[in-house]
């Protein structure tokens, strides 16, 4: 078996899985590292700024994004520090009180620092339902964009100051890119990150 972490190896040992065959000492389990990290680092050089973010920042800075070349756009903006946030898990979105609490906190944080939130379709639908109940959850300080592809997400992670998420994968990617991460869950499957 190929394991991504020492913790995974310890878990298999605790479950009684043999590390080697007793006859010839052939190793059955080995830590090969995390292929998710390999992928993230490989695609980092191919990452691109999401069009919605590029357009937003060009409006803020007065620049015409159509006149900028990709090399300029893909550089980390010096004055455009932001928090990257994603929310999609049922434990956070199915409970109206919890969802409202999360967005109240995000709106408060957004008064001091820009938050970019690629909004999952499921979360968007639930927010729209709450908005129709006259429960305003979104303010102008919170930058909502449509979901982005992997290369755009890699760019957002690489260029942010902080990650806030309930996504298991994004927690790990934040670690790979040496970003602090606030996990918006009661527990995580990635105990190595805590």
Report each predicted region and the residues it spans:
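Short amphipathic alpha-helical segments
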Residues: 13-14, 97-98, 128-131, 175-178, ...
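Residues at the starts of beta-strands that form the adenosine-phosphate
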Residues: 28, 114-115, 180
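A donor-sugar binding/catalytic signature common to diverse glycosyltransferases
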Residues: 156-193
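A nucleotide-sugar donor-handling region in carbohydrate enzymes
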Residues: 2-70, 80-95
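Short, glycine/polar-rich helix-capping loops at beta-to-alpha or helix-loop-helix junctions
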Residues: 7-19, 126-127, 183-191
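Donor-nucleotide binding loops and adjacent catalytic segments primarily
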Residues: 48-56, 62-69, 78-159
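Generic beta-sheet signal
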Residues: 4, 32, 86, 118, ...
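A short beta-strand/loop micro-motif in the catalytic core of glycosyltransferases
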Residues: 1-5, 12, 115-117, 163-164
């Amino acid at each position: 078996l190929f394991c991504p972490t020492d913790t995974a190896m310890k878990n298999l040992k605790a479950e009684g899985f043999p590390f080697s065959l007793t006859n010839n000492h052939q190793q059955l389990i080995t830590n090969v590292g995390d292929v998710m990290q390999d992928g993230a680092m490989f695609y980092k050089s191919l990452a691109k700024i999401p069009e919605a973010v590029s357009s937003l920042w060009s409006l803020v800075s007065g620049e015409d994004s159509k006149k900028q070349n990709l090399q300029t756009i893909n550089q980390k903006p010096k004055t455009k520090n932001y928090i990257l946030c994603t929310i999609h898990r049922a434990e956070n979105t199915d409970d109206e009180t919890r969802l409202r609490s999360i967005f109240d906190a995000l709106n408060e944080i957004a008064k001091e620092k820009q938050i970019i939130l690629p909004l999952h379709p499921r979360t968007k639908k639930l927010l729209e339902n709450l908005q129709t109940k006259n429960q305003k959850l979104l303010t102008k300080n919170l930058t909502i964009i449509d979901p982005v592809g992997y290369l755009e997400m890699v760019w957002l992670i690489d260029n942010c100051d902080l990650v806030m998420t309930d996504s298991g994968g994004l927690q790990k990617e934040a670690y790979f890119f040496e970003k602090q991460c606030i996990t918006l869950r009661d527990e995580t499957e990635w105990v190595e990150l805590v």
